Amino acid sequence: MMKVAAAVCIQNGKVLLASRPENKPPSGWEFPGGKLEPGETPQQAAKRELLEELNWEVLPLDIIYQLKTPKITLYFVRVIPAGNSTPAPCEGQQIKWETLSPEFPCGMLENDRNFWKFISLSTSR
């Protein structure tokens, strides 16, 4: 089973999303991240992937949601920026800060939709 870490950064009511690189279908918006390497925790993978993909130093905190399907375990890891760093995509993808609301962002990938619903409901209370 494939294990994937997705980084969740919420700042000022907005959530960081990244587009999938053109060479990695399906296309759409997702929480940035990637596959865990052998022996790596989801937090370590989230930190490594954001550095590789977005040249962004973050501090990984806790796993706030986990989604299991027959093919994948997806860990959503809360992260905060390290210092004054900002994301700068370096693998051809785009990023955007999406306002947190009950509506899914247009083009959001299916596996991320359940988590989007979870965080939008959790933060609206």
Which residues does each predicted region cover?
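Nucleotide phosphate-binding site architecture
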Residues: L16, E37, F104
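Conserved N-terminal beta-strand and adjoining loop/helix that marks the start
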Residues: M1-L16
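A conserved beta-turn-beta hairpin within the catalytic core of GNAT-like acetyltransferases
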Residues: K24-G28
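Active-site-adjacent beta-strand/loop module that shapes the phosphate/pyrophosphate-binding cleft
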Residues: L59, Y65-S101, D112-S122
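Short secondary-structure boundary/capping segments
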Residues: A7-V8, P21, Q66-K68, T86-P89, ...
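Residues that recognize and position ribonucleotide moieties
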Residues: V8, W29, K96
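Structural detector for helix-capping/boundary residues
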Residues: G13, G34, R48, Q93, ...
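The catalytic Nudix box helix
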Residues: F31-I64
